[in-house]
């Protein structure tokens, strides 16, 4: 089994942030995502770019997206 790497271990200058198509322009919460070649993903808030972002490795991000798509009750309001 390979050693788990830290998904935060990227140069922030190399991050290209993309705004979610589900984020509106109405001054609400806007989610931005940066994807890296190895599958890591960072998630941030474009209204507060200096706040810490979340980092997921490829397996974590895949599990998160699958849970959202399956309407997992842990992620529904």
Over which residues does each language-model region extend?
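Negatively charged, low-complexity tracts enriched in Asp/Glu with abundant Ser/Thr
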Residues: 1-18
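A short, structured beta-strand/loop element
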Residues: 20-59, 63-66, 77
């Amino acid at each position: 089994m390979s050693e788990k790497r830290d998904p935060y271990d990227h140069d922030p200058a190399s991050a290209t942030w993309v705004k979610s198509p589900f984020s509106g322009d109405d001054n609400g919460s806007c989610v931005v995502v940066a994807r890296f070649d190895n599958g890591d993903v960072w998630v941030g808030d474009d209204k507060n770019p200096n706040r810490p972002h979340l980092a997921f490795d490829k397996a974590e991000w895949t599990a998160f997206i699958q849970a959202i798509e399956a309407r997992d009750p842990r992620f529904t309001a």
